[in-house]
């Protein structure tokens, strides 16, 4: 599989931000935008594993403040609405009339908000590990379900912060947010590592999924900072924005693959979306968690993209 970029460059989107984009696959094939997670994960060649590059033209973008994108200040002018605007600016820059979206975890949030905002240019939506992006969803990931399965690992996370901030989501995120923007380099590193290590603990019920990028101190810090930024601000969305507006997609094919044992984005969120969008094609994968690399998730995603895209 040739994963070399067909086209790459920077798109100036204003307010000191330049977002990096690249494409791969067949330019004459069906256009599919890969929307990465995090926020803050960025893109790399591994993101292409889901696609048939002989028949698909894959477009990838590093969201504001991460990957190879450039920013004067990564947190200023970095909201969900800004990211949606960047995706639309990229579509226009590439002169694509319509495209299909594929996003997992936070990428599913952003893909849905984009599709709700610009339904006229969206062919289909493929989602993995749905994340609705509400305050309660962030709180569940950081302080909720996972601690029942990994209590010792969760205690390690909590021990990194003052006791008064360990059970209240607002105090928890405020403390991380303040420290990660502060001047104590050692403490910033400690908290960023604790945040990302906890998230990685929850990725897969089958075995510990090693994210090699997480060993990169710069990547780890950016990921923790941007996730905390979006968690603190409840994804910059009104409560239940997706559920209350997703009906605009009722006439479009929307597919969701969700691991039954996802501890980052519990299956209950997928069921909420199904109730709000009865036409949703929901595929629950057994013996699978959050990671797109879990065998049952990966096999299902590749099959759907190959047969439905």
UniProtKB/Swiss-Prot annotation:
Recorded name of the encoding gene: pip
Originating species: Mycoplasma pneumoniae (strain ATCC 29342 / M129 / Subtype 1)
Keyword presence, DNA-binding: no
Top-level taxon of origin: Bacteria
InterPro entries on file: AB_hydrolase_1, AB_hydrolase_fold, Peptidase_S33, Pro_iminopeptidase
Segments forming domain AB hydrolase-1: 33-291
Gene Ontology cellular component terms for the protein in this record: cytoplasm
Record-given protein name: Putative proline iminopeptidase
Compartments where located: Cytoplasm
GO process annotations (BP): proteolysis
Catalytic activity, EC: 3.4.11.5
Family of the protein in this entry: Belongs to the peptidase S33 family.
Reaction catalysis annotation: Release of N-terminal proline from a peptide
NCBIfam families the UniProt entry points to: pro_imino_pep_1
Keywords from the UniProt entry: Aminopeptidase, Cytoplasm, Hydrolase, Protease
GO molecular function: aminopeptidase activity
């Amino acid at each position: 599989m040739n994963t070399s970029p067909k086209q790459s460059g920077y798109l100036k989107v204003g307010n000191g931000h330049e977002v990096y984009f690249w494409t791969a696959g067949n330019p004459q094939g069906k256009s599919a935008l890969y929307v990465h997670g995090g926020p803050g994960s960025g893109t790399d060649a591994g993101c292409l594993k889901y696609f048939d590059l002989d028949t698909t033209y894959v477009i990838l973008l590093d969201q504001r403040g991460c990957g190879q994108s450039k920013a004067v200040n990564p947190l200023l002018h970095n909201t969900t609405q800004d990211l949606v605007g960047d995706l639309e600016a990229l579509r226009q820059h590439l002169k694509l009339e319509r495209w299909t979206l594929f996003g997992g975890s936070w990428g599913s949030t952003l893909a849905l908000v984009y599709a709700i905002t610009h339904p006229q240019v969206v062919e289909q939506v493929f989602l993995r590990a749905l994340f609705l992006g509400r305050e309660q969803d962030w709180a569940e990931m950081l302080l909720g379900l996972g601690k029942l399965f990994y209590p010792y690992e969760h205690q390690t996370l909590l021990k990194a912060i003052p006791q008064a901030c360990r059970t209240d989501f607002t105090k928890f995120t405020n403390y991380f947010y303040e420290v990660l923007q502060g001047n104590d380099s050692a403490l910033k590193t400690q908290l960023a590592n604790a945040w990302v290590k906890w998230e990685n603990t929850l990725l897969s019920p089958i075995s510990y999924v090693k994210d090699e990028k997480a060993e990169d101190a710069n990547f780890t810090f950016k990921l923790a900072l941007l996730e905390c930024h979006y968690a603190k601000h409840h994804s910059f969305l009104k409560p239940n924005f997706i559920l209350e507006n997703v009906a605009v997609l009722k006439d479009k094919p929307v597919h969701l693959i969700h691991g039954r044992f996802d501890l980052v984005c519990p299956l209950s969120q997928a069921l909420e979306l199904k109730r709000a969008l009865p036409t949703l094609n929901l595929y629950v994968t057994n013996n699978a968690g959050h990671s797109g690399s879990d065998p049952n998730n990966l096999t299902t995603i590749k099959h759907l993209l190959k047969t439905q895209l």
